[in-house]
From Swiss-Prot:
Keywords: Acetylation, Chromosomal rearrangement, Chromosome, Citrullination, Disease variant, DNA-binding, Hydroxylation, Intellectual disability, Isopeptide bond, Methylation, Nucleosome core, Nucleus, Phosphoprotein, Ubl conjugation. Its main location: nucleus. Core component of nucleosome. Nucleosomes wrap and compact DNA into chromatin, limiting DNA accessibility to the cellular machineries which require DNA as a template. Histones thereby play a central role in transcription regulation, DNA repair, DNA replication and chromosomal stability. DNA accessibility is regulated via a complex set of post-translational modifications of histones, also called histone code, and nucleosome remodeling. The lineage of its organism: Eukaryota, Metazoa, Chordata, Craniata, Vertebrata. Changing E64Q: In a breast cancer sample; somatic mutation. There is a cross-link at K13, K21, K32, K60, K80, K92 (Glycyl lysine isopeptide (Lys-Gly) (interchain with G-Cter in SUMO2)). The modification N6-butyryllysine is found at K6, K9, K13, K17, K32, K45, K78, K80, K92. The modification N6-acetyllysine is found at K6, K9, K13, K17, K32, K92. It comes from the Eukaryota. It comes from Homo sapiens (Human). Residues 1-20 are annotated as: Disordered. This is Histone H4. Acetylation at Lys-6 (H4K5ac), Lys-9 (H4K8ac), Lys-13 (H4K12ac) and Lys-17 (H4K16ac) occurs in coding regions of the genome but not in heterochromatin. Acetylated as part of spermatogenesis progression prior to histone-to-protamine exchange. The keyword Ubl conjugation applies. The gene is H4C1. The modification Phosphoserine is found at S2, S48.
Length: 103
């Protein structure tokens, strides 16, 4: 058996991998208006200019932690696809129980 894992059951040698865009500086995709809308939802009236970069940094750390845990659950289950339940369990592990996504 060639070392193609669980998914490689077809014939041939496995084609070329698709090109994947290099991800960099995507945190800037969290725009100033988006942060402002989140703050408004939280009841904030005025926002300091320094808040935007700080918010991006905090959000990045939070998402890195949640995604790391979710991927750990996925790998333990020997899957390659992260499911909604993986994310729910990852959030629960961090003390942020999320309802409405199964389980």
């Amino acid at each position: 058996m060639s070392g193609r894992g669980k998914g490689g059951k077809g014939l041939g040698k496995g084609g070329a991998k698709r090109h994947r865009k290099v991800l960099r500086d995507n945190i800037q995709g969290i725009t100033k208006p988006a942060i402002r809308r989140l703050a408004r939802r939280g009841g904030v009236k005025r926002i300091s200019g320094l808040i935007y970069e700080e918010t991006r940094g905090v959000l990045k750390v939070f998402l890195e932690n949640v995604i790391r845990d979710a991927v750990t659950y996925t790998e333990h289950a020997k899957r390659k696809t992260v499911t909604a339940m993986d994310v729910v369990y990852a959030l629960k592990r961090q003390g942020r129980t999320l309802y409405g996504f199964g389980g």
